Amino acid sequence: MLMIKAINFMAKKHKGQTRRVSGLPYITHPTIVAHLIGKYKGDSKHLEELQITALLHDVIEDTDCDRFEIEREFGSMISSMVMELTNDTERIKEIGKPEYIKQKMVSMSKYAFILKLVYRL
């Protein structure tokens, strides 16, 4: 049931957004990431949380959503992983993107790291 809630939440938040190159509705990207997580991490004890995080991974960066709304709707584990995947634009300006990515990857939880790798495929 939480998965359906996440799909609806993501669709509402990304409504009207499209992928830059393809022009497809933006929700195709997080939906594919959630599918790939299911394919490659199907045996994970936190599969549902990983897939929900995949669905929500860009809602803070690209919509009016904040971490508190994610936590209220989906819990602290999912909120924490979404935050790990959310870029801090101010920090990127401060230290540069290569250094930011290096610091982010080193401090990321294994679940967020897996999600990051999958959505970069």
Where are the predicted features?
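Active-site helical microenvironments for divalent-metal-assisted chemistry
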Residues: 1-121
